[in-house]
């Protein structure tokens, strides 16, 4: 990354003059030099440099013992010990009003046994005296192919708070009512809307589409989560100018969301290539070869600059020989819920039980 590109990134993030002009509402306990930065190195080293009670939200998706350790797979107990040490530090730096969202999947051991990690992580948070708020199920329309088991189509997000007094804002994350105009038909409220006009609580089953090769946010990172899912978490548990920490920030999804929602971010990523790409996404600019890390960054750049024909640019996940199209956009959660419902209805209509009934 060139010096000019780095200056452009700093300008985009309001990081000029080494953060000397940051607003004075930032808590003095949090080092200003860390705000809106991605630490390239071990996450424990980053965490040890953060003061107690200085972060408003911790949200992350730790490596599930794959990809990050190359060919050096850790035994489950060793992996959990390492994660416990990280979580202890996250608890220490979290403000009393703060939340931790820890997205976990499944650990597959050498014999092929699938162990859901949420049941192993729950006691870790509980041992720190944290308060469980939700076990969120993230359902995806599509999962990995499987021949000897049911295909996995969900992961879990554990939400814990440090104290019983925590931040939570429902209105910014409400979703449309199923029957938006439904009214009370009797009683004192007859004729009034039966539901909240702002929408309903989204519940603890989320249907955000997983980031894959046909998703506009897709980069070279193997386990990327969608921005709209992190947006829901940030909006519901923080306020503008709060500090969001991601100890495994990867390609900077959490950083992008925090920046777009006027929050400060800090995170760690051990892979230098991922850090460079994260900063490029944050800058919204092409590299020296007119390439973007993903389709979304390219589309936003063209929309911002009034570019109709993007043929002079490329993006990393672009298919060979194809021209970039600006039409592809990520669908909202409601779209994916509809996909899931339609799939369930299709399976019900074509079930073996239904066929047997029809034959009788």
From Swiss-Prot:
Its EC number is 2.1.1.113. Residues 326-341 have a biased composition (Basic and acidic residues). Pfam families: N6_N4_Mtase. It catalyses: a 2'-deoxycytidine in DNA + S-adenosyl-L-methionine = an N(4)-methyl-2'-deoxycytidine in DNA + S-adenosyl-L-homocysteine + H(+). One of its GO terms (molecular function) is DNA binding. Keywords: DNA-binding, Methyltransferase, Restriction system, S-adenosyl-L-methionine, Transferase. InterPro entries: DNA_methylase_N4/N6, MeTrfase_CN4_CS, RM_Methyltransferase, SAM-dependent_MTases_sf. GO terms for cellular component: cytoplasm. GO terms for biological process: DNA restriction-modification system; methylation. It is an enzyme of class 2 (transferase). Residues 316-341 are annotated as: Disordered. Belongs to the N(4)/N(6)-methyltransferase family. N(4) subfamily. This is Type II methyltransferase M.BglII. It comes from Bacillus subtilis.
